[in-house]
A protein has these predicted regions:
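Short beta-strand elements
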Residues: 172-174
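A short glycine-rich, hydrophobically flanked beta-strand micro-motif that places a catalytic Asp/Glu
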Residues: 152-166, 170, 267-277
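A general "terminal functional-core" signal
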Residues: 242-244
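Secondary-structure boundary elements
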Residues: 143-155, 163-166, 178-183
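Active-site microenvironments that recognize anionic phosphate/pyrophosphate groups
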Residues: 1-142, 177-240, 249-353
């Protein structure tokens, strides 16, 4: 799956379709025990896409007059696929009918301002123009995308409205964590975790505490990170049957969907990360989007994983873990009592049903 799409990504780069080139990215380690990465590209200050809204609500309707993916050129399409029988299947002709039982065609688009190699967008049923609101019926399919990747560093990202989504047209982003480490200058602060690997994001080394365990799913709270967050995790056995894998995927999707429903009920913006072949899902539950003005950082999904995109060279050069943490706790975090009530309510929601 990944290699076929990478071929098309390379074609787009060669044709000059990207506003910024991956080779021009500057990356470096940020000193500190969290092993954060800072990233900067000079062109990001020069080219900006107009926002399709100023102050969105979490369920803002789709706006056909704002930027949306129906306006993307065919040359920026990397592939079209659907999900069937636990597999991601490529479509040769978009006019061909989908197989019986399949109702979602995913268009894979070039991200024209890539922050890693093969940075892509996944848009379900592009022409139906869903707004950027989670569709619970697609959760298991997103997990299948992760399961089908050839690579251990495949990561799916989602920013909700009010959580720094810049386009109100339903989409997820695909990135590869090893790309963030490949050209980072300097050295990570020692000691590195024993299980350190480029196939993990900085977030994945954060301390967690267990909130509950179900038959297959473990729910954990991420501690002392850039955002308050919940981690849902399953473990796969190499010898498990396909039916057992389906049961685990369903339970994981159920626990995740209930978490997202709780976010919408409380009007709490959120950002999501699917990683480790879909076995782990992190959800950042955060306050309404607000930039870290002094640092020139928008704390969206990628930034909250520990890959911090700076919008000014000066801020990039001065990147500091402690200052970043302090600012995130002011801008992104809920008050402890609000957060504790939310977590308690979610745990009761799952455990008692």
């Amino acid at each position: 799956m990944d290699s076929a799409i990478k071929t098309q990504f390379d074609r787009c780069e060669a044709e000059g379709l990207c506003r910024s080139d991956v080779a021009g990215l500057r990356m470096k380690w940020i000193p500190g025990q969290k092993h954060l990465i800072a990233q900067y590209h000079p062109t990001w200050q020069l080219v900006k896409r107009k926002a399709s809204f100023q102050k969105p609500t979490m369920t803002q309707p789709f706006n056909p007059d704002g930027f949306n993916f129906t306006k993307v050129k065919e040359s920026e399409v990397l592939a079209r696929v659907y999900v069937k029988d636990r597999k991601v299947v490529f479509v040769r002709d978009s006019s061909d009918p989908l197989p019986e039982g399949v109702d979602t065609l995913y268009t894979i688009l070039l991200n024209v301002s890539p922050i890693c190699n093969n940075h892509q967008l996944l848009v379900p049923n592009l022409e139906k123009c869903y707004n950027q609101v989670w569709r619970y019926d697609l959760t298991e399919n997103w997990i299948v995308f992760c399961e089908n990747s050839e690579r251990d560093d495949y990561v799916l990202f989602f920013n909700s409205l009010c959580g720094f989504s810049s386009v109100n047209h339903l989409h997820l982003q695909v990135m590869y964590s090893s790309s963030f480490y490949a050209t980072a200058t300097g050295s990570p602060t020692l000691p590195l975790p024993d299980d350190f690997t480029p196939s993990k994001l900085p977030l994945e080394y954060a301390d967690c505490r267990v909130l509950f365990k179900r038959e297959f799913v473990v729910c954990l709270e991420v501690k002392d990170w850039l955002s308050q967050a919940i981690k849902l995790s399953i473990e796969h056995d190499a010898n498990e049957t396909a039916e057992m894998g389906d049961r685990k995927r369903r339970e994981l999707a159920h626990c995740f969907n209930e978490l997202i429903r709780a976010c919408y009920e409380q009007a709490f913006p959120y950002d999501v990360v699917f990683c480790q072949h879909g076995s782990d899902i992190y959800t950042f539950i955060r306050r309404y989007q607000q930039p870290l003005e002094d640092l020139h950082v928008n704390p969206a999904c990628v930034e909250l994983t520990g890959v911090v995109v700076y919008r000014s060279e000066e801020s990039f050069d001065r990147a500091d873990q402690d200052i970043l943490m302090e600012e995130c706790k002011k801008v992104v975090y809920f008050e402890p009592s609000i957060w504790d009530d939310f977590v308690r309510s979610y745990v009761n929601r799952i455990v008692n049903n």
